[in-house]
């Protein structure tokens, strides 16, 4: 084994080391975000282990029936939510939490309060668990001005105010993608070390992609610009090859592929869901933040996604995100439609 390769293999950039490096670039940093992120990472490791069916044997019991004496198995999404809420509260760095699983925001006990708000979906795509499709955790972090008098209003900030965002995908491997506002980096969980190692430094999405990702089962309810765009993907007028369709139906997996390979992911509004289906605070915003940090863009059909100001915590929005030029094309179609309506 040559020495150079060996040196490279033994110099591990863990997520903790990466975040500490980022912190040291900012002279007024107190380490609060670093501590908060390490608690999120712990939550992700726990969920990764649970999703991988750790402890399954105890649950099923030797005879193959479900263990009757033991507690009934908690649904994974409920379990994941509890783990994240407890990890975030105990970090002492949060004052309010918004989870997809909880109808109301959670205000942290004053003694444990810190200056951050975390919005998260503990297990996105959890309806896919049984068929082995990748699922994930999504999170976005905001700063709160006055932690002692925090209100719901403080949570309803536009996405551009986020200080960090990321997702963790539990698939064939466990991958955590993170941005603290200075580019996007991907880390993979090394199960033998229990550490996330930097495997995808400085992710940049291709300027234009060959893939479109959308649930075409909703096509009959789409608006005009969406229908036109998908038509162009399939039957390009300019002689170029048609785009490939890839749709997993788990947002984390679809966005992850879009980020790495380029292309566009869309969940448009339709007649049944006039505001689309994805939630602003913990799906649309974090993914849009990552896309922009990676050189792509994100659009709601009306505006840049990160400029949207939500009015309630579980608000929904249509979303088009991905490669810069592909989203630019969608923006053009919406602009043309608006002009048409204006003239009528």
Curated annotation (Swiss-Prot):
Which superkingdom? Answer: Eukaryota
Q: Where does Mg(2+) 1 bind?
A: 71, 100
Give the UniProt family note.
Belongs to the FBPase class 1 family.
Originating organism: Oryza coarctata (Wild rice)
Cofactor remark: Binds 3 Mg(2+) ions per subunit.
Which NCBIfam families does this entry report, sorted A to Z? PRK09293.1-1 (NF006778), PRK09293.1-3 (NF006779)
Q: What else is known?
A: In plants there are two FBPase isozymes: one in the cytosol and the other in the chloroplast.
Principal cellular location given in the protein's record:
cytoplasm
Give binding positions for Mg(2+) 2: 100, 121, 123
| Name of the featured protein | Fructose-1,6-bisphosphatase, cytosolic
């Amino acid at each position: 084994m040559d020495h150079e390769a060996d040196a490279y293999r033994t110099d591990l950039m863990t997520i903790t080391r990466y975040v500490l490096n980022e912190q040291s670039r900012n002279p007024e940093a107190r380490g609060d975000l670093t501590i908060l992120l390490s608690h999120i990472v712990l939550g992700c490791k726990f969920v990764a282990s649970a999703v991988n069916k750790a402890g399954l044997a105890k649950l099923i019991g030797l005879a193959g029936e479900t263990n009757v004496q033991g507690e009934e198995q908690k649904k994974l999404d409920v379990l994941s939510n509890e783990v994240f809420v407890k990890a975030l509260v105990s970090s002492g760095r949060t004052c309010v939490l918004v989870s997809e699983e909880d109808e109301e925001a959670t205000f942290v006990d004053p003694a444990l309060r810190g200056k951050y708000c975390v919005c998260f979906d503990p297990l996105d795509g959890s309806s896919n668990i049984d068929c082995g499709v990748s699922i994930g955790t999504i999170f976005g972090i905001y700063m709160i001005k006055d932690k002692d008098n925090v209100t719901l209003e403080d949570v309803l900030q536009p996405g551009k105010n986020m200080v960090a965002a990321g997702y963790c995908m539990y698939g064939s491997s466990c991958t955590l993608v993170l941005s603290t506002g200075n580019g996007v980096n991907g880390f993979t969980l090394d199960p033998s070390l229990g550490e996330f190692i930097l495997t995808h430094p400085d992710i940049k999405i291709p300027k234009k992609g060959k893939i479109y990702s959308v649930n075409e089962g909703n096509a009959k309810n789409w608006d005009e610009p969406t229908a036109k765009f998908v038509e162009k993907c399939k039957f390009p007028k300019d002689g170029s090859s048609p785009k490939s369709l890839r749709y997993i139906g788990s947002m984390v997996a679809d966005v992850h592929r879009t980020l790495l390979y380029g292309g566009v992911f869309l969940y448009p509004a339709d007649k049944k869901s006039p505001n689309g289906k994805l939630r602003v605070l913990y799906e649309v915003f974090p993914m849009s933040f990552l896309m922009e940090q990676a050189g792509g863009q994100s659009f709601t059909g009306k505006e840049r996604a990160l400029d949207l100001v939500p009015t309630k915590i579980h608000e929904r929005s249509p979303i088009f995100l991905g490669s810069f030029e592909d989203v630019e094309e969608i923006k053009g179609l919406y602009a043309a439609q608006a002009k048409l309506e204006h003239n009528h």
